[in-house]
Amino acid sequence: MSPESTGPAAVIVLAAGAGTRMKSRTPKILHEIGGRSMVGHALLAARSINPEKLALVVRHERDRVAEHVSAADPEALIVDQDEIPGTGRAVEVALKALDAGAELAGTVVVTYGDVPLLTGELLAELVSTHESERNAVTVLTAVLDDATGYGRILRAEDGTVTGIREHKDATEEERSIREINSGIYAFDAAVLRKALESVTTDNAQGEMYLTDVLGLARDAGGRVAAVVTEDRWQVEGANDRIQLSALGAEHNRRIIESWMRAGVTVVDPSTTWIDSTVTLDEDVRLLPNTQLHGTTTVARDAVVGPDTTLTDVNVGEGAKVIRTHGSGSTIGANASVGPFTYLRPGTVLGETGKIGAFYETKNVTIGRGSKLSHLGYAGDAEIGEDTNIGCGNITANYDGEKKHRTVIGSGVRTGSNTVFVAPVTVGDGAYSGAGAVIRKDVPPGALAVSLAAQRNAEGWVLANRQGTASALLAQAALTPASPSSQSPATTEEGNQA
């Protein structure tokens, strides 16, 4: 189904479960995989088939889930499930909400908020099959080696689906069936509406099972069929942390393979993690232990890694980022960062610039070709073009109450261990001496020094550190050599014998 195709009348996403096996204060469907919540993945897949309406059923942590869903998909209708349990009841209340004003006609798709690998392509296939075969119900199924816990698909001799038996209600013979119900369906809206009127809670769980609709539809003369997917991961849900981890790993594997097919080199896929929201160009090279999160983008010919984590960072063409932890930053084309660099939000490094080893930056703009090579901190600052910041330089931006800015011009050269006490401005082409503490503005082209003349307190170590190794070595160095210690090859006159 292409983006221009007419989609189903509605998609209903079921997300009311408590997810107790996750053992978390965070609602199960809000746990993330690949940089997006599980329900976020579900909403994305649902929207991709262009439904006329989309509803999401909530109950557990209702307000928290509703807020998240509204932010992710403002057009989604939030529906509250009442005290009557079961998927059948969840769909019933959603359908009533969707029917407000005018009853739905056409196809209604039901899916879940905890099936993060389900794709829009598979949902589109389900809808297409359902409508082309004029089915009353079409269920998405998969064949598993171990079907424990899943509802089993019951079929007639002609292959049509006669019903679904929940695992806890299944006989031993039925439990041997390996074809399972994914819980994802396409219904004719009128058939669904009518069948739900007859669904009861008369079962082992005391719930309204949505699966009962299949039998009721068949009894009413409707055709019930299935679409079988060979990709079991698309119908796998996450009920606990173990399943969440497995789904996350599979999702990451698919993302990495997709990028490699698109021209990205991933040296070690087993140690590389890429969120689904990341964008990479051709000929990007990712080295081992690289993690790319959020809205990170990496341009052509850039190299990232090893041992690098970037979140919401834009990396320019041909840039190199080595052993760096960065967030909310921009790295210009052909710039270099690292190793052991910490880029905090607001860092902007210009083209061909450099932030080197053991540097931390925050809310700083660094001009084209400027270099901060090693051992320093630059925060709340603006640095011009082609400036060289010496080793150990620091912008002292915080006075204990407020943050202040440092402005350093273009073509500036600063000596080692210079401290800029903000607010302060250094003009274009200025220099600072080693160890300078810059408290006042420096005019363009000036040399700023702030150290007093050096004073040597001779004999201080001998007087104050008696008996130490330093004192003993100093004493030996200060004691004149005796005649007997002179080389026998030298005469009293100092001439060679």
Region locations from a protein language model:
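Conserved alpha/beta core of the MobA/IspD/sugar-nucleotide pyrophosphorylase nucleotidyltransferase superfamily
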Residues: P3-G7, R178-D281
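Conserved core of the sugar-phosphate nucleotidyltransferase
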Residues: D63, L118-A204, T211, T229
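Conserved N-terminal catalytic core of the sugar/cofactor nucleotidyltransferase
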Residues: M1-A10, E32, R36-G113, L117-S128, ...
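Glycine-rich hexapeptide-repeat left-handed beta-helix
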Residues: G316, K320-A497
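Short, high-confidence coil segments that cap the C-terminus of an alpha-helix
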Residues: P51, E103-A105, R134-V137, G222
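Terminal amphipathic helices with adjacent charged low-complexity linkers/tails
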Residues: V224-L247, V278-D281, L287-A299, V303-V321, ...
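Short beta-strand/turn micro-motifs composed of small residues
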Residues: A15, V58, Y112, T141-A142
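Short glycine-enriched, charge-decorated loop/helix-capping segments at active-site entrances
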Residues: T26-E32, E83, V199-D202
